[in-house]
Regions:
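Conserved catalytic helix of short-chain dehydrogenase/reductases
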Residues: 1-13, 23
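Short-chain dehydrogenase/reductase
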Residues: 7-8, 77-80, 84
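Short, small/polar-rich loop/turn modules that mediate ligand/substrate recognition or access, typified
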Residues: 15, 20, 91-93
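Conserved SDR Rossmann-fold cofactor-binding beta-strand/turn motif
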Residues: 20-30, 84, 97-99
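Short, flexible catalytic-loop segment of classical short-chain dehydrogenase/reductase
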Residues: 25-36, 40, 44-45
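C-terminal beta-strand-loop-alpha-helix "lid" module of Rossmann-like NAD(P)-dependent dehydrogenases
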Residues: 40, 44-58
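A conserved structural motif in NAD(P)-dependent oxidoreductases
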Residues: 48-51, 62-76, 87
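Short C-terminal tail/terminal secondary-structure segment
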Residues: 80-81, 92-108
Length: 108
């Protein structure tokens, strides 16, 4: 929450100088550590890492999202590249969810 407040405060303070400030809130994201974590859980559960991930992102799982898969770190990178580009000048002071559609609440 404090990072969100800092984002909004900075956006207010530096916007007049043409600087944008945003906060990316990623969901469960595949990184270089993901395989190790999935393997550990698979060993505990007695199934394969692929089965662990399939269960995690199956409909009805508390870990799933609307696209039923883990977000890849490159997808967060694409969003970051857009926000750093001149094409995103109108986006500032925002918390941008990039989790594949987690949750059903509307925040505005």
């Amino acid at each position: 929450v404090s990072l969100v407040h800092m984002t909004k405060t900075l956006a207010t303070q530096v916007g007049k100088f043409g600087i944008t400030v945003n906060c990316i809130h990623p969901g469960t994201t595949r990184t270089e550590r993901t395989a190790v974590m999935l393997e550990a859980r698979a060993k505990e559960m007695g199934i394969t890492p692929q089965e662990v991930e399939a269960q995690d992102f199956a409909d009805g799982s508390p870990r799933t999202n609307h696209i039923n898969r883990m977000i890849d770190a490159s997808e967060i990178g694409y969003l970051t590249a857009y926000l750093a580009s001149d094409k995103s000048w109108a986006v500032t002071g925002e918390v941008i969810m990039a989790g594949g559609g987690t949750g059903n609440a509307v925040y505005y």
